[in-house]
Amino acid sequence: MTLGTKLSVDQEYLKSFSEKHQEPAWLKNLRLQALEQAEDLPMPKPDKTKITNWNFTNFAKHTVDNEPLSSLEDLTDEVKALIDIENEDKTLYVQRDQTPAHLSLSQELKDKGVIFTDILTAAREHSDLVEKYFMKDGVKVDEHKLTALHAALVNGGAFLYVPKNVQVETPVQAVYVHESNDTALFNHVLIVAEDHSSVTYVENYISTVNPKDAVFNIISEVITGDNASVTYGAVDNLSSGVTTYVNRRGAARGRDSKIEWALGLMNDGDTISENTTNLYGDGTYGDTKTVVVGRGEQTENFTTQIIHFGKASEGYILKHGVMKDSASSIFNGIGKIEHGASKANAEQESRVLMLSEKARGDANPILLIDEDDVTAGHAASVGRVDPIQLYYLMSRGIPKEEAERLVIYGFLAPVVNELPIEGVKKQLVSVIERKVK
């Protein structure tokens, strides 16, 4: 197989992997077909970011063996800080590299028909349900080489299913711990909320090691029925040696359904992030709030897109990013209103603050409108720290580093304060504190 870089798995390996995990025939066949498709599909072409030489395929091992946790106390302090250890009623999934290490789901939620488990177990035990949605309504296998490779190599992730008329009152959490230098992660998260249901899902990606050249290919899909609501929070905190492709996509299928995203994109390595919400149903609502801090020499590209198909649909994008050192980033915000989506409203704001002469940021607001009776607006700004602000703070006896930190918090606060998940707010503040030192 020729992918510019040699891929370390082949068809025979995938057959063996699928059989080992007792996967249904549809998933095994999907893997094999996807690997073939990846041969000919092009790489994605993120706007203004050249990824030709990025490593998305070269990794030592597709999986490594880890042990399940005998207790959450066995986690490192850094990981335990993300979890409410004392809460005995928490709904939690912990994954160590690719290994499902801990799962807790209350009997009450089980009795209501809620399913929450790792993606490979879900494919085996709830085959028809997973097959119905897996890379169908959200991300398609053949979009480009990286989506095809993801479909072929999925080795982790979670499945969350909320039946009709069920409201999950407390957040569902998944923690994905990267602790091996040798392995790649192809994580797939699939969330389905049936009619008149609601759920909040929060995930953490965290590295406890810093490999030289790791590969992460992450896809999340959210599907909502009539009047269903999903709030999806994420804090990505992977180390500088990890090259990441992450694609989070929502499909608001049902009328008056809602998908909200609260994303803290804090990776230290090169990252391509796509976040698209398709508002198919009439009266649907999509909202994406994103906070980014880049540092070192990393290159990042963030594309946030809300596409309106349904009448009277509403879409809001709010992104603030801070670039330090020699980091560079592209922020693309796209509001697209398709023909027939009358009364739709598309609004967006993207702002980038650069803290050094070598830092680079670019904000590109884009509106694509194919309908007359709509409302749309955008705002964007890119700039450096105002020296007058720093001078004012320093003149009050505040050291320069502390003054810069206060300016950064002031810049990011309008987004952080608007995040709909309190736990994500607290985690983000902690990560921001570490990254802006």
UniProtKB/Swiss-Prot annotation:
Domain of life, per lineage: Bacteria
GO biological process: one example: iron-sulfur cluster assembly
Record note on quaternary structure: Part of the SufBCD complex that contains SufB, SufC and SufD.
Similarity comment text for this entry: Belongs to the iron-sulfur cluster assembly SufBD family.
Functional description taken from the UniProt entry: The SufBCD complex acts synergistically with SufE to stimulate the cysteine desulfurase activity of SufS. The SufBCD complex contributes to the assembly or repair of oxygen-labile iron-sulfur clusters under oxidative stress. May facilitate iron uptake from extracellular iron chelators under iron limitation.
Protein name (Swiss-Prot/TrEMBL): Iron-sulfur cluster assembly protein SufD
